[in-house]
Each structure stands twice: as structure tokens, then as C-alpha cells.
Amino acid sequence: YIDILGEPTNLAEIELILATTTLLGKLDFKNFTIRINDRRILKAMAAYSGFPEESYDTVFIILDKMDKIGFEGVAKELEEAGFAKESVEKYLKMFEEITPDTAGVEYCREKLEGFLDKEYADGLKTIIDSVNAVKTAEFKIAFDPTLVRGMSYYTGPIFEIAMDEYGGSVGGGGRYDEMIGKFTGNQTCACGFSIGFERIVMLLLERD
């Protein structure tokens, strides 16, 4: 686990992603992908589509299955959960139009005006551009609006390491600015990243 406490800016996310990817690069892992999103973009997309706020968790649980059941499966489950077909179609249309880069973030910035504070989209673009500018390992960083990271305590950017040779995620994290304050009474911004070392070791052993 790596956590940075007390840093309110996106420097924390940039440092965490670079530290983790540099480590993976030193272990000779290549061509993996950092999937990145922001919980506030997730919520803004749900609000724009007309889903009631109290149902967001249900929407995100279903969205999180996108990799397994695809667009049609997500649409079917959302409608079976009682959501209006119009809202479901409006919601999924955005995912079809968003590209996995800063242009996709810009799309969200403009499309979700009135639902999303533009500084959140700008912050995500800064993270992506900064990581691409100074990274030393061979990997891609991709905006993925379907990335949910199940924990509801995340408050901002969230990210995951997707490794093709493993066929899944080998680590992830995000910003959780409210959690420490709930336990200590002292509001402390925080951002963390964890790696599944067992999976990494398994991949290293398989490689040898």
C-alpha cells in the first residue's frame, strides 16, 4: 500500500501512479494500462441521465459489470432494476461516444455542464497529461468512464492497473478525502494505491 495524506491537489494522484508504474517497469512489466476515472464524473453522468441520486449505488453496481456482460447486458439489468428506458438509453449513449483519452474527458466536461464542476474534468486531464509527459515505464493511461472501484468512500479520481497477460486488475486506488475525518474528527485529504503482490509474484513466476 502507498498512501499520501494531506495533499489536496492532483500531485498526489500523479505521484502514486508514477511510483507504482515505475516499480512495475523495474520488474520488466510492459504494455499494461492504467484505467482512470473520477467518482464525480460517474455521479454527473448518472444525474444527467435522470437517475435519482438515491439509486446511484445500484446504477454503479450494474455498470461495474460492463466488462463481463457488455452494453446490452448493462441496459437489460438497468431496465430490470426499474429504471426508465429513456434514462438508460441516454446514459449508455454517452459511453459509446466517450474516447479513452483526454478528448473523452473534454467530452464529459462539455456534455455534463451543470452537473459536473469543470475543475474536476480539468484535474483528470492534468493527471493523464502529466503522467504521459514524465513516465519511464512502458504503459498506457486511459480514461475509462465505466471504471467504478466498488468502494463508495472514494471521493475523486480512481484508478486501476489492467494487465493483459494476467487478464484482470493487479492493483488500484483513488482519492478518499472524507474517510479519515469520519474516524478521527480531523478532516484530512488522502489518496492511496495498493498492488496485489501475490498476483505480481505469480506473474513473475509464470514468466520464469
Can you describe what each PLM-predicted range is?
Residues I36-S49, D64-G70:
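Short, conserved secondary-structure transition motifs
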Residues F51-V74, M163-Y166:
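Acidic, His- and aromatic-enriched active-site or binding-groove loops in soluble protein domains
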Residues D28-I34, E53-D57:
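Short secondary-structure capping/junction motifs at helix and strand boundaries
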